[in-house]
Amino acid sequence: MSVTQKKTEISTTTTYEGESRPSSGMSGFSYSAKIHPRTSGYINRSSQSPFRSSMGSNAAYTRSYDFSYGATAMPGRYANISSTGVNHVKANREREKQDMRDLNERFANYIEKVRFLEAQNKKLAGELEELKSKWGKETSAIKEMYETELEEARKLIDATNKEKITLDVRVTELIDQLERQQKDLEESRTYHQIDQEQIARQNQQLADLEGEISMLRRSIESLEKEKMRQSNILAKMNDEMEKMRMDLNNETINHLDAENRRQTLEEELEFQKDVHAQELKELAALAYRDTTAENREFWRNELAQAIRDIQQEYDAKCDQMRGDIEAYYNLKVQEFRTGATKQNMEVTRNKEENTKLKSNMTEIRNRLADLEARNAQLERTNQDLLRDLEEKDRQNELESCQYKEEITKLRGEMESILKELQDLMDIKLSLELEIAAYRKLLEGEESRVGMKQIVEQVVGARPNEAEVLSTILTRSEGGYEATGGITTTTTTSSQERRSMSEEKKSMGSSD
């Protein structure tokens, strides 16, 4: 009676390729399942039990299990996940699902094979009972051996169930982690969309700020042109003011000269009136007095003395008038110099203001470079610049108004001076008319023979003076003919002329 030996070997190996190699016949099976990159754990189990045949020989029953599991280190931040990374995660998830399905299928195959082994064990147990009934002790030994191996198989099943539970928990954790990753991915996409919108807004804001900077630069250029134009206008106005001041000075000098001539003519007129009145009185006195040689000599000396006194008084008055005119002219010159000093001060002030404006423009240009880097403060700085520019415009307008007012004032003063000059010319013309009237009157009286004799007697040994007097009268006649129109003056003095003619007739009869 022969005894056959049986050896059953169960080997489980997990590999990445997912290959499954079933056992040949009914003696063993093997499968493999591995999910990369989960390599954090590795289990290797093996068991071996002796097998005693009914013939007393030993047989080895070996079981070997290799399991590997794990998970890769998940990243802590998902802010920079790109579409490629997302696709990679999706591909890994699909691959993991496929691996899990393969693992479940293989695990089902494994359970079926375990059941098959249990059925085979039952069959073997039946055969063992049959053998026990046949061989006795050998069957009991085989029974013990199979019971031991069955116990180990039960332990192996329990361990496999525990590992299955662990794997189920791990799968649940992985699913939860995957859901969290999907949620984080959605949040990352939302943040990415928000960042894109913010970048677009910032680009638009940057473009607007660059446009405002360009507009400010153009405004500054236009303000510089306006400043140059205002400077040119100011220079022209200063030139016009200089010309007007020169014209005013010339007109003032002419006015002073005319005033001087007027006063000189008035005083000369007064002097001539006094001389003629004195002569008339002396002539009247001589007409009623003794005409001896001694009296004539006495009166000649008195007349010469009176003429000298009058000449001295006239010279004194001329000197006084000259001093007053010089003082007045010096005062006016001092006033003009003071005005020129004020004008120079105004020009200096304008230059300082221009320098300040240039420095302000330089500061503005320097600030523009900072404003390009500080877009957040650009609006406030632009408002400050606009306020400064408006203030400068107001200052320029005020200065222009002041210059216009000064020009209007100077024009009014010049018109008043011209009016005064015209009045002086009218007064001078009237004085010349009056002087010509008096000369004509004297000429009419001189044409009489008695008047000539009286003059010759008064003048005596001074024929040159008589010639001078006649020359003056001739000139006065020419001036009268040039001016003309003295009918009223001669008419008003007709009674005086009749009285003078009667006196001359009486003097001629007495001679």
From Swiss-Prot:
Residues 450-511 are annotated as: Tail. Residues 304-449 are annotated as: Coil 2. Residues 21-30 have a biased composition (Polar residues). Residues 483-492 have a biased composition (Low complexity). One of its GO terms (cellular component) is nuclear envelope. Residues 136-145 are annotated as: Linker 1. Disulfide bonds: none annotated. Residues 96-449 form the IF rod domain. GO terms for molecular function: structural constituent of cytoskeleton. Residues 285-303 are annotated as: Linker 12. Belongs to the intermediate filament family. This is 60 kDa neurofilament protein. It comes from Doryteuthis pealeii. The lineage of its organism: Eukaryota, Metazoa, Spiralia, Lophotrochozoa, Mollusca.
